[in-house]
């Protein structure tokens, strides 16, 4: 999925002048869990030649990791560093002790219904030359699917 913005608890990332971006941590591909791992419980029959399904359960919820930074279309190069007050506002908004409504958005999605998730974030700083230029968001949901 390609996304540039998201809504979380009724507010948009773009309201803060930020976009979803990617910092080049390595040249390898990124692998993300779909959060839908199912455990199948089976009973062996016919001396192990056949198994019958007795139960299934989801073992993990949806998780994702992505970066955010200031929108370069709104800020000059020398203004791309995240200031303390901007960092504080983003942390208050994103780093909560509860799951809140979330949806990822691209430019076309703002006017149509999409899939929602109940999520919260753990946040890490992305520093370049000891200056804060971005945040890495580790999204965790309360379900293995959206609604």
Residue ranges and their predicted role:
Residues 1-147:
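Extracellular/virion structural assembly segments
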């Amino acid at each position: 999925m390609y996304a540039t913005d998201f809504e979380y608890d009724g507010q948009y990332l773009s309201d803060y002048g930020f976009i979803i971006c990617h910092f080049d941590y390595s040249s390898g591909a990124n692998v993300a869990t779909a959060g839908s791992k199912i455990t199948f419980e089976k009973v062996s029959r016919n001396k192990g030649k056949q198994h019958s399904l007795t139960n299934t359960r989801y073992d993990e919820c949806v998780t994702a990791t992505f970066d955010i930074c200031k929108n370069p279309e709104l800020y000059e190069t020398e203004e791309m560093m995240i200031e303390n007050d901007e960092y504080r506002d983003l942390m208050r908004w994103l780093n909560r002790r509860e799951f809140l409504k979330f949806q990822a958005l691209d430019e076309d999605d703002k006017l149509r219904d999409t899939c929602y998730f109940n999520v919260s974030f753990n946040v890490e700083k992305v520093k370049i030359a000891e200056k804060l230029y971005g945040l890495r968001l580790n999204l965790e949901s309360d379900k293995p699917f959206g609604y």
